[in-house]
Amino acid sequence: MRRVAFFLTAIAALLATAQTHYEGQISVGAKGGVSLSRVNFNPSVEQIMLPGMTAGVMFRYIEEKNFGLIAELNMTQRGWKENFEESDYNYSHRFTYLELPIMTHIYFGNRRVKGFFNLGPEINVMLGDGIKSNFAYQDAADMEYFTNDTRHIEQMTMDIKNRFDYGICGGAGMEINLNSKHSLLLEGRFYYGLTDIFPNHKTDIFSSSNSMTVTVTLGYFYRLK
């Protein structure tokens, strides 16, 4: 019991010392970059990653050395692009989301260059969507290419069920401090959605249709405190 009490007292003392000698930091910034996304259909749909854009604003609060929190408000394009292999057909369905990730921020390095990891939950709202195609996808069931193929085509005309999405995101990157106030950062991030975009009841075609997105962004932070 004494050992446990001593251990807890020592930990508390270390935390108090760290907080005493470390000055908290508050930074705001902006970022932009590219996204690559797909929809995890089950049964599977032949597709390739759909490229898009992402941009947003960032808030970072660091209370202890090597540890902090980051919140962002981003606009990101997601969706999927059908893979028709050797055919000239083209179909993609793009979603535009407003994202709010809140992540734990862990960093390491020196004053000039730092590496970091971010991990946390994310909630999203779909603001709009659009389909781009070079054929009458509404009539795909009557087209010879699709009647002779075993691929699913129902997703091309299916109505969206959930415009609210939540999931888990995680990323890693590098930050370069230009001086005491300004810094640049490069980050790669992966998002895995936990909500299905399309209906997923037993009578529906797809049992899952969640989003998966990779983003690569370049950002800028300005330190307020």
What are these regions (language model features)?
Residues 24-26, 47-53, 94-100, 113, ...:
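Residues that define the transmembrane beta-barrel architecture of outer-membrane proteins
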